[in-house]
Amino acid sequence: VNEIAPRVHNSGHLTINAYNISQFENIPFDTLNEINKLKKVLPKPSVNRLIQHRLAEKDFINKLNIRTTRYVSIEKKSDIETLEDFLPGILKTTTMGYDGKGQFPIQKIEDVNSLNIDFSKGYILEKLVKLKKEISVIVTRFGVNSFEIYEPIENNHEEQILKQSKIPAEISEKILGQSLEWSKRIAEELKYIGTLCVE
């Protein structure tokens, strides 16, 4: 831990303007867990492990009665051959995917044969849906019943990579209210301490 995160030992002291802060969700769970033994990590390492796994993350969200696109776990190539009703869809690695990486658009069963997919990894197949737009809601939770929820942000992508975000998002009052309520529900259920972005 000392070699990986030398700043851990300084984190218990009040420090102003000393370090840059960056956002990256793919920090190994074991690394965060070791740091957590020395200095409390917030949000909890278990939260980071959950959001790093697309299948576990979607299972969690659906248990909160928040709808996602239809999805199914894929362990081997032959699994897809029985799932024609999920197509067109997007096959995604369950871990380490971001900015379009680890994603394979599949229009029909035959497409699987033409794609270079390593089935030794875990995958999730998501039913393709036509999105009108993507929004993000940022929630900062300090503790039980202590949080701030910020105005939704509208995101525009090019080739699956975020290019622009704008405020205010052009959304209905219904979508506004629902997005704020869902974001709060997720943060509360996770017992999240810190700042969370829900897309």
Short names for language-model regions:
Residues 41-43, 69, 90, 124-126, ...:
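Structural detector of well-ordered beta-strand residues that form the stable sheet scaffold
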Residues 1, 106-198:
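Internal nucleotide-binding/catalytic subdomain
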Residues 17-25, 29, 51, 55, ...:
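Electropositive phosphate-/nucleotide-binding environments in soluble metabolic enzymes
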Residues 28-85, 96-97:
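Conserved N-proximal alpha/beta basic substrate-recognition cap immediately N-terminal to
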Residues 5-27, 37, 178-198:
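Active-site "cap" helix and flanking loop/linker of ATP-utilizing ligase/carboxylase catalytic domains
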Residues 60-66, 92-100, 157-168:
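Acidic/polar active-site rim loop that often engages polyanionic ligands
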Residues 16, 46-50, 69-73, 104, ...:
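Glycine- and other small-residue-rich loops at beta-strand/loop junctions that grip anionic moieties
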